[in-house]
Amino acid sequence: MAGIRPRYLVFILSILMMISGIALAWGAQNNLGTVQATEITLTTSGGVPISGILQRPLAATPATPLPGVVVIHGVIQSKEWVMAFGIELARRGFVVLTIDAVGHGNSGPSVGSNTDQGGIAALDYLNGLAYVSTLGMVGHSMGAGIAIQTLNETSTPVDSLVLVGGGSSNMATWANASVPRNIFVVVGLYDELFDVPELLNSLATPFNTTTPVIPGQLYGNFATGTARMVILPPTNHLFETIDPTCISATTEWLMTSLKGTPDAYWIPSTLLLYPMWVAGGLISCLGAVLSTLALFTILIQFKPFRRIQHSPNSRYFAKTPLYLAMGLLYGVLGLLALFAMLLVNLPFTYPQSLGLPVVLGLFLGGLVAFLLLICIKFFLQRKEDPPSWNDLGGFNGLKNGGIKSLIMTLSIGFLLGLIGIIWLYLWVIPVDLYLALDFRVFLPFLKALSPLRALFVPLYFFLLLPVTLIDGLWIMGYLRTKPQEKWWYTQTWWTSKAIFIKVLIMAFILFIQTVMSFIIGGPFISGFMGFYLLFLWIFIPMYAVSTTYLAWSYRLSNRFYIAVFFNAFLFSWLMAAILPIYL
């Protein structure tokens, strides 16, 4: 009994972590009860459903209307990615509608030549609310472009426009010194998609000046609606939506342009609550990971799961020079294959933008890595005691009942992996339905799926399954390090070393990009290559999580099949959730 008590204790503690993280995030999104967040569905003129979160301060009534703001996210994102704007604006007396653009999040897919990407429908909805007075718009990246398109196609008056990391490089083609009203441009100093000197030059005409625009200087005035300003906070494209300077400056601008002066609801812009929302997501996601690890540990004690429970094999381990050299090679191969597929124009289309290039890149990298592993095995056969497939966490031959044993092991691994995914989804759905909250806030992990998006999961699963299997053979097979004296120290050592070697190349690239950008005062690698590097910020935490599952699966069963199936489901869920859909 004493042997299983820690498993249940960790399981209970992880559930408490999830509950506390959800409570923190909900408290921030609802400003501790003074704001009501509601999930709503709109419809564009083309009949596409738009998913949104409406945050209404309880003080907003027909008798005391408050300004309304539409907030729109960037590409390969969803409304949660810009929720920090909604949180800080709503608690300061703004009615905020944050939407999933067409083809993104839980909104309907982009079909044909749809002109309304959700902005017009959202603006019309807010304009029709009796407790909303004036209107403003905030758009990040692609969302900035949608906001501009919306203003060009609607007659609804908008008194303030905030463009974050997008829409401003060609402003002279759609704006002048007075139209649109009160424009605020926010571009990260290290934004990979902008050349700052070129941007400041291009803003001269709409800012009504003949010289390059000076960051932080107010041009025009709010009384006539001609106010313009640009700021360059020290951040990159991806993190503009959670950068404190971006958030604070945006709230200040909208307060001045839509309210005129601070009112009874105003809170100093430096007093930010959204970090509590981010912390809640981190805590709940960490609890989710721990809960599945504990769940696997509990379930494997029972029939029929315990048939695959075995102590880990310690006969083979990779020495440090081999671990580093081959680990780096494995990481480089994977990255080269991924970026090669991203940069190549495929001769056919796929409904989820970038889905096929990413999956094929991962598959190609896995295939090359597997062929390399076979070559290494063949070379090592000449040595005295080469590692067997069994030593690497694979299977011990197909003779003498080997096929039956392999099928049984794979079946149980699949079932446990599926149970783990179902367990997580059973947490995600009620949080989304009853709290109007995304379980993982803005993190690229554990997002509720629309029925259409759910259809993509099995398609990705079968393509990613060989990738996660090969990853197991490398990370917890060929590159598995020497065990230590105590099991918990060994597990910690295995997990940390596995994560280190898995993300080393990606972390190094991001480190160089960050440091060099800081040194030169702008993005070191810019353009689309710089944009694609932002994907590494998604892959690193996901690989850290998947590698943790690999190490624990090996601990439980001397195999990594539980994690192979679970990780294939997990990455399929991730891709189905975040990639745009264009039909």
Stretches with model-predicted labels:
Residues 16-20, 286-293, 469, 543:
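Alpha-helical transmembrane segments
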Residues 21-25, 293-297, 334-341:
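Alpha-helical transmembrane segments of multi-pass membrane proteins
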Residues 262-292, 300-324:
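Cytosolic-side membrane-insertion boundary helix
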Residues 2-43, 51-53:
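An N-terminal hydrophobic leader/cap segment in hydrolases
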Residues 241-255, 281-297:
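P-loop NTPase catalytic cores that bind/hydrolyze ATP
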Residues 325-583:
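Alpha-helical transmembrane segments of integral membrane proteins
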Residues 8-17, 284-288, 364-365:
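Hydrophobic H-region at the start of alpha-helical membrane spans
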Residues 32-272:
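Soluble extramembrane regions of membrane proteins in the secretory/endomembrane system
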